[in-house]
From Swiss-Prot:
It is an enzyme of class 1 (oxidoreductase). The keyword Transcription does not apply. The chain crosses the membrane at residues 172-192, 215-235, 250-270, 294-314, 332-352, 364-384, 392-412, 418-438. It is a multi-pass membrane protein. Pfam families: DsbD_N (PF11412), DsbD_TM (PF02683), Thioredoxin_7 (PF13899). Keywords: Cell inner membrane, Cell membrane, Cytochrome c-type biogenesis, Disulfide bond, Electron transport, Membrane, NAD, Oxidoreductase, Redox-active center, Signal, Transmembrane, Transmembrane helix, Transport. It catalyses: [protein]-dithiol + NAD(+) = [protein]-disulfide + NADH + H(+); [protein]-dithiol + NADP(+) = [protein]-disulfide + NADPH + H(+). It is found in: Cell inner membrane. GO terms for molecular function: electron transfer activity; protein-disulfide reductase [NAD(P)H] activity. GO terms for cellular component: plasma membrane. This is Thiol:disulfide interchange protein DsbD. CDD domains: DsbDgamma. Required to facilitate the formation of correct disulfide bonds in some periplasmic proteins and for the assembly of the periplasmic c-type cytochromes. Acts by transferring electrons from cytoplasmic thioredoxin to the periplasm. This transfer involves a cascade of disulfide bond formation and reduction steps.
Length: 568
């Protein structure tokens, strides 16, 4: 029964992993009645000049954030050295991957070059709202003659709604995921067969009753958990200093290669573990501890966390890289603590039941190990897809899902009965088909929606298109740095019912990614707060502000919005 459950869970996990991202965006639409702040209200800028030191700060409104990689000082020769960016928190979205952002309040200091003779410098920054609006790149000039006219930057009251960088809700999901992964690691062939021996070592000569077993097993797990948690703390604290570098293409490639190597280890291509000499010394010290007492059992658990088996070394290394990239010390400790608790659950169950609640060791454990290998390989693809065209990443994912399904199906064909074989293979085939379809459909929708619009590049082009049309004109303002703009293209404009309504409109689009003089003129002329923004012009050529769309709108709501305009 356990074997069937594990293999079916593996297949369903593959299906969920590819269906959930597409569903979540469409099932959680942002309402259009959001009242967005102006850029200066969302990001209250302040500066102070003290001799050669300049300090700039932003008070960031709740549910808004600034991008770390958008911070820049112009001209660059005004700086004495490359300024160190303040620590931020990790932010992930479907289109741009992992970024470092600032919420609530951020302060940035840098030193001026003594040889710089200019009177002013310019600070550039850019941010977005959680509700789906991104502001154009913003510039603020700072006078360097004596002291800045602005007031000194002071920290506001602490309004942080989350203790953890990845957010409380996301942290809970992450902890549950790593707890489940810990349970999965416990069923790998290097770990699971050791539980009978380990249970005997933990109990020592103590009387074997459920109270002693539960208590000592818990102490052992705590020793292992604290060791892992300390590893997470060390790695996260180191990652905090280098968060910005984790977004560099070279670093992403290196990380992708590392995860691929970890995956090969789980496939049995080579053995990844501590040097034998280190293991011998740790095991020798562990052997000197006596089971059956709290201190001895705790030390044995702590040492077992260091002597990682070949089956756990690769996933543990992958978890450490994940924590290093987040740079969040608190969540780093919590994640590895959850992972180790998951690994300890089977030990506690084994001790309490004498092994009756757990399956017998067998070939099915290799399936679990291989499943972890495919999960690590998926991380490799997630990392490199940020650096390659969508068309290429689409085919890589298709190849991945098919190969993973075939590989797992072949692996489970031996240890399972014929009924379970058929069920599991069907589930794996469904996972591969679903994943492949989603990737192909995603690429096709992006191309399809993007080709609907006539491209305009300045105010004159817009005015000409509006003047020549005898229908309603819809002007879509787009930029590559706008996450919600991409959501519009992929999930809203690609909808068949929306496209049916498009027949009543002339569609034009202005790409303001570069934020050059022409782009700024467009945004200024039409008083655009941020992106995405969609303007509507009636057949007489007048812009109708009451129909303007600011921020993301899902397909159903946008279709109704178009119907309302046409029915006028």
């Amino acid at each position: 029964m356990i074997q069937r459950f594990i293999t079916c869970l593996a297949a369903l996990t593959l299906v969920f992993a590819v269906v959930a991202p597409a569903h979540s965006v469409q099932s959680n639409p942002f309402q259009q009645d959001n009242q967005f702040l102006s850029v200066d209200q969302a990001f209250d800028f302040d500066s102070e000049v003290n001799d050669s030191k300049v300090t700039v700060s932003w008070v960031v409104a709740p549910e808004y954030y600034l991008y770390q990689h958008r911070f820049k000082v112009v001209p660059e020769n005004a700086l004495a050295a490359e300024p160190e960016l303040p620590q931020g928190e990790s932010h992930n979205d479907e289109f741009f991957g992992e970024s470092i952002v600032y919420r609530n309040y951020v302060e940035w200091s840098f030193t001026l070059n003594p040889e710089f003779s200019g009177d002013t410098i310019t600070v550039q920054y850019q941010g977005c709202a959680d509700a789906g609006l991104c502001y154009p790149p913003t510039e603020k000039q700072i006078k360097l003659s004596s002291t800045s006219e602005t007031a000194p930057a002071t920290a506001p009251p602490n309004t942080d709604s989350s203790l953890f960088g990845i957010g409380e809700q996301h942290l809970i999901i992450t902890l549950l995921l790593f707890f489940a992964l810990g349970i999965g690691l416990a069923f790998t062939p290097c770990v699971f067969p050791m539980y009978p021996i380990l249970s005997g070592v933990v109990l020592g000569n103590r009387e074997r009753n459920w109270k002693n077993t539960l208590w000592l097993s818990f102490i052992y797990v705590q020793g292992m958990a604290i060791t892992y948690s300390l590893l997470g703390l060390v790695v996260a604290s180191a990652g905090m200093q280098y968060q910005a570098y984790f977004q560099h293409p070279v670093v992403l490639i290196v990380l992708a290669v590392l995860f691929a190597l970890f995956a090969l280890s789980m496939f049995g291509a080579y053995t990844l573990q501590l040097p034998i000499s280190w293991q011998s010394k740790l095991q020798s010290f562990s052997g000197q501890q006596s089971g059956g007492n709290i201190v001895g059992v705790f030390i044995i658990g702590a040492i077992s966390g260091l002597v990682a088996s070949p089956c756990t070394t690769a996933p543990l290394s992958g978890a450490l890289l994940f924590i290093a990239q987040s740079g969040d010390m608190v969540s780093g400790v919590a994640i590895l603590y959850a992972l180790s608790l998951g690994m300890g659950v089977p030990l506690i169950l084994f001790g309490l039941s004498g092994g009756k609640l757990l399956p017998k060791a067998g070939a099915w454990m290799n399936v679990v190990k291989q499943f972890f290998g495919w999960l690590l390989l998926a991380v490799t693809l997630f990392l490199i897809e940020r650096l390659i065209p969508t068309s290429i990443s689409m085919w890589l994912w298709i190849f991945y899902f098919i190969l993973a399904a075939v590989s797992l199906a072949v692996s489970i064909s031996q240890p399972l009965r014929i009924t379970t074989k058929v069920i599991t293979i069907v589930l794996l085939a469904a996972a591969a088909t679903t994943g492949s379809y989603w990737q192909v459909n995603k690429a096709q929708l992006e191309q399809k929606s993007h080709g609907l619009f006539t491209v305009v590049s300045n105010v004159s082009d817009i005015q000409q298109q509006v003047a020549e049309s005898d229908r309603w004109v819809m002007l879509d303002l787009y930029a590559d740095w706008c996450v919600a703009c991409k959501e519009f293209e992929q999930y809203t404009f690609s909808d068949e019912q929306v496209q049916a309504q498009f027949q009543e409109f002339k569609l034009i689009q202005a790409d303001v990614t570069r934020n050059n003089a022409q782009d700024v003129e467009i945004l200024s002329r039409y008083k655009v707060l941020g992106l995405p923004t969609i303007l509507f012009f009636d057949p007489e050529g007048n812009e109708r502000p009451e129909y303007r769309v600011t921020g993301y709108m899902n397909a159903e709501d946008f279709k109704k919005h178009l119907e309302k305009i046409v029915s006028e």
